[in-house]
């Protein structure tokens, strides 16, 4: 998945501490259908916190733990959630979106 639309890097406002390591950014890859199991597509599109806390660890590098997800800065969770939703949009929809 070298295509830029299949992978996004999110720079964290509040780094995650894992032992002596600071995680300052998380790479999210476009989920395959299996990574969405146990969630509802509508919940993901609504950026439901529970749905995102299920899906994001499955598609993140490094893989985030449940505890790390629970302690995320809400701004960082929102930034990652936006990227997850963007992955689910068709290319034709993305082409029609305004760019910054």
Outline where the language-model segments fall:
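Short, surface-exposed, charged amphipathic helix/loop patches that serve as local interaction elements
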Residues: 2-100
């Amino acid at each position: 998945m070298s295509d830029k639309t299949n992978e996004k890097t999110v720079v964290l406002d509040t780094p995650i501490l894992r032992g002596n390591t600071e995680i300052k950014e998380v790479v999210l890859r476009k989920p395959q259908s299996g990574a969405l199991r146990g969630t509802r597509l509508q919940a993901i599109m609504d950026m439901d916190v529970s749905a995102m806390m299920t899906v994001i660890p499955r598609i993140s590098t490094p893989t985030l733990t449940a505890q790390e997800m629970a302690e995320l800065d809400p701004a960082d969770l929102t930034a990652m959630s936006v990227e997850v939703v963007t992955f689910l949009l068709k290319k034709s929809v993305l082409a029609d979106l305004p760019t910054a």
